[in-house]
């Protein structure tokens, strides 16, 4: 009957082993790509969301170095979302500027057509 305590110890050890978070290397890569993409579309250090993303990415790297993988994953995920938000805001600003430019041209054309009649 000594098998039961040994079996329980093995099961407990297996559960503890599964509870450890793996290193979030893939998430860090995704986050780095998201930051690079936001920068590529025109986000700068003046964009608060990009600054937040970079700060969280730096913290995620520090957490990785300390082997605090759960914290690293959470920081990296948040940084990725912040970078994507910065990218979306920059693209929205560019789109709004293009719409305003088209509206200005349309107004000029309307005036020209009205003056020609």
Stretches found by the model and what they are:
Residues 85-117:
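Surface-exposed, polar helix/loop patches in the mature regions of secreted/periplasmic/lumenal proteins
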Residues 14-17:
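C-terminal motif of bacterial Sec signal peptides marking the signal peptidase cleavage site
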Residues 1-7:
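Bacterial N-terminal signal peptides that target proteins for export
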Residues 36-78:
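Post-signal-peptide N-terminal segment of Sec-exported extracytoplasmic proteins
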Residues 27-35:
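Juxtamembrane extracytosolic/periplasmic "stalk" immediately C-terminal to the first targeting helix
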Residues 19-22:
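Bacterial signal peptide processing site
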Residues 66-96:
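A contiguous, mid-protein "functional segment" used to position or interact
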């Amino acid at each position: 009957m000594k098998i039961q305590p040994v079996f329980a110890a093995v099961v407990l050890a297996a559960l503890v082993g599964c509870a450890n978070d793996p290193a979030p290397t893939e998430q860090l890569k995704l986050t780095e790509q998201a930051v690079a993409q936001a920068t590529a579309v025109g986000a700068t250090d003046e964009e608060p969301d990009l600054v937040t993303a970079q700060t969280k990415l730096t913290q995620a790297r520090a957490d990785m170095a300390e082997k605090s993988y759960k914290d690293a994953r959470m920081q990296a995920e948040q940084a990725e979302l912040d970078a994507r938000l910065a990218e979306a805001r920059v693209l929205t600003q560019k789109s709004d500027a293009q719409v305003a430019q088209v509206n200005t041209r349309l107004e000029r054309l309307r005036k020209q057509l009205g003056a020609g009649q």
